[in-house]
From Swiss-Prot:
Pathway: Amino-acid degradation; L-histidine degradation into L-glutamate; N-formimidoyl-L-glutamate from L-histidine: step 3/3. This is Imidazolonepropionase. 4-imidazolone-5-propanoate binds at R72, Y135, H168, Q236, T313. It comes from Cereibacter sphaeroides (strain KD131 / KCTC 12085). GO terms for biological process: L-histidine catabolic process to glutamate and formamide; L-histidine catabolic process to glutamate and formate. N-formimidoyl-L-glutamate binds at Y135, N310, G312. GO terms for molecular function: imidazolonepropionase activity; iron ion binding; zinc ion binding. Catalyzes the hydrolytic cleavage of the carbon-nitrogen bond in imidazolone-5-propanoate to yield N-formimidoyl-L-glutamate. It is the third step in the universal histidine degradation pathway. It is found in: Cytoplasm. One of its GO terms (cellular component) is cytoplasm. The lineage of its organism: Bacteria, Pseudomonadati, Pseudomonadota, Alphaproteobacteria, Rhodobacterales. InterPro entries: Amidohydro-rel, HutI, Metal-dep_hydrolase_composite, Metal_Hydrolase. Its main location: cytoplasm. The gene is hutI. Zn(2+) binds at H63, H65, H233, D308.
Length: 395
C-alpha cells in the first residue's frame, strides 16, 4: 500500500475531473481512494510527494500495427516524387513489401525490431497498447506476429491487447481469390490463435482494395462463434457501410472513418461502438476529408485517438503527437483528446478497469511535468513524462 500525495489529478470521471492538492491511495494493483489530500483517510502507508505534478491515467494506444519487419522509407521518397500507388507496388513497395519482410523474419528478429517502438511509446506515458497481426497473410506468420505481441507484454511493463487482422489484405498468392483466402488462411489461423490464447479481438479492413462487407460479415460471424469481440477498419478511403456493419456486430470500435456518413454515425451511436480516430494516417496520406467529428460529438459517440503505428501509412509512434494532430487536424478539444487516449480508448479495447482514476480501477498512472492536462495535447515534441506506474508499481 502507498500514497501518492501533492498531486493535481485528472481523474477523467467528469471531463478532466481535476482535483487540485490531491492524493491517491493505492493497494496492490488497484486504486483504493482518490480525492483532496486534506480528506485522505488515516493510513500508515508510505507517502510519496509528487511535487505538485499532474497525474492522469496512463495513456492507451488502442490501434497499432507495431509488430513488423522492414521499412517503407524508399516508397515514401517515391510518393513524394510523384509515383502512383500502382508504380510503388510495381517497384516492390506497398503492403506486399512489409508482408515479405515480415514473413522472412524470425520471431526473435520481429521481437528485436518491435521492442524499440514499444519502448518509445512507454516513454510517452503509454501503459496499454493494442497490437494487430496482418503483415503475415499466411497462417504461420500471422500466428508468429501474435506470439511476439504476447511476448512483448511479458518483457515490458505494459498491458498488450492483441487483434487478429488476417483480413488486412489479399496476399499475392491469393490475388483475385479473396473468398478462398478467407476460407483457407484467415479462418484456420483464427481458430489456432484462439486455441492458443493469442487473440483478444478480431479486426478486418472493409474497403474496395481489401474485403467486402459480405466477406467481413462472414468473418465476424465466425468470430462470434469463438466468443471473440470484433472491430473494423471502416470508411477510410470510401464509404462501403463499414461502420454500420461494425455496429450490427456490436463491434468494440470502428476505426479511421474519414468517409463516415450520417447513417454510420447513427449506427455507431445506437450500438455504443467507439469511433477511433487516426490522424497520423490522415496526415501521412495527405487526405483532405476528415472524419465528421462534429456529427460524432452531437450524436454522443465516444471518440478515441490512436497512432495507427505502421510502416506504410502512419509511421507514428508518439501518442502525444497523435493527440495534438487530433486537435489540430480534426478539431477535437484537448479534453476530448485526453479522454480519447484514456477512458474511450479503454472502451475500444473492451477494458473496463483502466482509463480513469477512481476506486477499483487499476493503478495505471502517468505523472507529468505539467500543470494542466491540456498541455499533453498542446505540446509538439517529447512527452513531459515524469514517471509512470503500472499496476501500482513505479516503472
Amino acid at each position: 500500500m502507498m500514497i501518492l500525495g501533492n498531486l493535481r489529478v485528472a481523474t477523467l470521471s467528469d471531463g478532466y475531473g481535476l482535483i487540485p492538492d490531491a492524493a491517491i491511495l493505492i493497494e496492490g494493483d488497484r486504486i483504493q481512494w482518490v480525492g483532496p489530500e486534506a480528506h485522505l483517510p488515516p493510513s500508515a502507508a508510505p507517502r510519496h510527494d509528487m511535487g505538485g505534478r499532474l497525474c492522469t491515467p496512463a495513456l492507451i494506444d488502442c490501434h497499432t500495427h507495431a509488430v513488423f519487419a522492414g521499412t517503407r522509407a524508399a516508397e515514401f521518397e517515391m510518393r513524394l516524387k510523384g509515383a502512383s500507388y500502382a508504380e510503388v507496388a510495381a517497384a516492390g513497395g506497398g503492403i506486399v513489401s512489409t508482408v515479405m519482410a515480415t514473413r522472412a523474419a524470425s520471431a526473435d528478429e520481429l521481437l528485436a525490431a518491435s521492442l524499440p517502438r514499444i519502448d518509445a511509446m512507454l516513454a510517452g506515458g503509454v501503459g496499454t497498447v493494442e497490437i494487430k497481426s496482418g503483415y503475415g497473410l499466411d497462417i504461420e506468420t500471422e500466428l508468429r506476429m501474435l506470439r511476439v505481441a504476447r511476448r512483448i507484454g511479458q518483457l515490458r511493463k505494459v498491458r498488450v491487447r492483441t487483434s487478429f487482422l488476417g483480413a488486412h489484405a489479399v496476399p499475392p498468392d491469393y490475388r483475385g481469390r479473396p473468398d478462398a483466402y478467407l476460407a483457407e488462411v484467415v479462418l484456420p489461423a483464427l481458430k489456432v490463435a484462439q486455441d492458443e490464447g493469442l487473440v483478444d479481438a478480431v479486426d478486418a479492413f472493409c474497403e474496395g482494395i481489401a474485403f467486402s462487407p459480405a466477406q467481413i460479415a462472414h468473418l465476424f460471424a465466425q468470430a462470434h462463434k469463438l466468443r471473440l469481440p470484433v472491430k473494423l477498419h471502416a470508411e477510410q478511403l470510401s464509404n462501403l457501410g463499414g461502420a454500420a456493419l461494425a455496429a450490427r456486430h456490436d463491434a468494440l470500435s470502428a476505426d479511421h472513418l474519414e468517409y463516415l456518413d450520417a447513417e454510420g454515425v447513427a449506427a455507431l451511436a445506437a450500438a455504443g461502438t467507439v469511433a477511433v480516430l487516426l490522424p497520423g494516417a490522415f496526415y501521412a496520406l495527405r487526405e483532405t476529408q476528415a472524419p465528421p467529428v462534429a456529427a460524432l460529438r452531437a450524436a454522443g459517440v465516444p471518440m478515441a485517438v490512436a497512432t495507427d503505428l505502421n510502416p506504410g501509412t502512419s509511421p507514428l509512434g508518439a501518442l502525444g503527437l497523435a493527440m495534438n494532430m487530433a486537435c489540430t487536424l480534426f478539431r477535437l478539444t484537448p479534453e476530448e483528446a485526453l479522454a480519447g487516449t484514456t477512458i474511450h480508448a479503454a472502451r475500444a479495447l473492451g477494458l473496463s478497469d483502466i482509463g480513469r482514476i477512481a476506486p477499483g480501477f487499476r493503478a495505471d498512472l502517468a505523472i507529468w511535468e505539467a500543470e494542466h492536462p491540456a498541455e499533453l495535447s498542446w505540446r509538439i515534441g517529447p512527452a513531459p513524462l515524469h514517471v509512470r506506474l503500472h499496476e501500482g508499481e513505479f516503472v
